[in-house]
Amino acid sequence: MSGDGGKSSKALTLVLLALVAASFSVAMYFQALNLMRTAGTSTTTSTASSVLTSTSPAATTRPWGSVTLSGAGASFLAPQMFEWSRALTETVGLRVEYQSVGSGAGRDMFFNKVVHFAGSDPPLSRELHEQYAGGVMQLPVVVGSVVIVYNIPEVPEGRSICLSSDVMALIYRGEIRYWDDQRILDVNPDLRGVLPHQEIVAVHRSDSSGTTSVLTAYLNKASPEVWSKGLVGFTVDWPVDAVGRGVGGKGNEGVTQVVKTTPYSLGYVELSYAITQRLPTAALRNAEGVCVKPTDQTVLNAVRNSTAFLPQSPLDDWSNVLPQMLNPPGRDSYPIVSFSYIFIYRVYPDRAVVEALREFIRWINTEGQERMVPGYLPITEEVRRVNLKAIELLEVGGT
């Protein structure tokens, strides 16, 4: 009996160990599955392609072989690019890695041929377009908006501040110091007694930024007497820094985090970041004098009401498009709307890279436009047709 009891005890032990091992394997399976689902949400470099390659077609069946496309640039574009990277690997087996380093740094990496393509909010200036004429193609791939996020504990959820371009310019010039300044209250009479007598912390980008270029171009267009052309660009000597009330953050990610953790601050980011971090966004007084919140509809209204003349080739000069998109007419138009662009060369020495770029361009202008991250809108059909011309323009050559 004791021998049988010992055998039974051992058998029971083995069964229990097997159950534990099975439970561990199941747990590891679901952990791995969760990692696969969440891959690509990094705010620096998408890793989705490395996780999902097993689901893609064999490399030998693809004209681009095992090439991985590399890109860098606008953090404005990054959340959408990470989603596209994940989906491209999953659906067609094309690996795309994107670094969210800011438009300025991304341009530098592109022109130094460190990466295959760049992401940028503003298009090339006329001078740069002339310098690279016939050699660089510009493709607007999403419609986005720059929004003002803020952290004012006294403003209850469900209520929103409104800011005019003059007020924003004066805040970043350091000339409006407190949240209860009369010039802010004039735009927000319903918040009299709510907005506190607290100093405004003006958060801005610390890196070379396309988002900064878009915001400052808007301020100069809407309030030229307050915000001069000398304060427009990728990097700005912020007057508010000189009076000790300005704080820099790297990337849209950095600005978002500074505002989120700093009471009585405000900053500017792409709408997707505000949505993800659940930060309140200000309504902006538009060209018709109406306070408008950033929504899909008000951004779409801005695009439709824009007077921008669209070039007919990716090789054309796009430098006039952004100024014409900012502060458009229309009572329901949101005033700070922009394309975000991808820059690619017309000629690459590696045929596999050219084939990969052709598929990349085809996909993001077709299937990719149906996979928009909240905070972005698809490009128009007219823009899509122009972008697709780049597929035929790409060539193999050079060294």
Write out the residue ranges for each language-model feature.
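Flexible loop/hinge segments at secondary-structure junctions
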Residues: 11-17, 29-38, 52-53, 57-399
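Hydrophobic core
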Residues: 18-24
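N-terminal Lys/Arg-rich, disordered targeting/topogenic segments
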Residues: 1-8
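Juxtamembrane proline-rich low-complexity "stalk" or linker regions positioned immediately after a signal peptide
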Residues: 41-53
